[in-house]
Amino acid sequence: MTMNLSFELPFPPSVNTYYRSSFRSRSVYLSKKGREFHQLALVGLMELSDAGTSDTLHPSFPTERLRIHIELIPGDRRSFDIDNRVKAILDVLEGHLFVNDSQIDELEVIRKPMDKGKARCRVTISEIKEQSNS
């Protein structure tokens, strides 16, 4: 049986505002927007948890090859590059719903029509079954 998991997350920040760097310590860290997105997204992911009361999520797809479908639904008419939003989504899912983003073989990102004031993204993760080459 192929496992599918669908859920919504807050609209992710652009990768341009997701990270900040410290020239003094030469390190890269999550920006305030990045941390806020992670916190809100993890609250939503905890609701998906089988345990419900657990403080941690265990990957639902520990070793499977994955297909990820992302629908970006903006809350206003401002333009944005869809590829700048994917990194934040995959980062928050990695370690919580799958072990590593190297498991992803197919990634589809679609811009949906604006839903005024209700920016969000829909994510569907599907297991890819091995196909025989007969």
Residue ranges and their predicted role:
Residues M1-S134:
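Acidic, proline/glycine-enriched N-terminal capping motif
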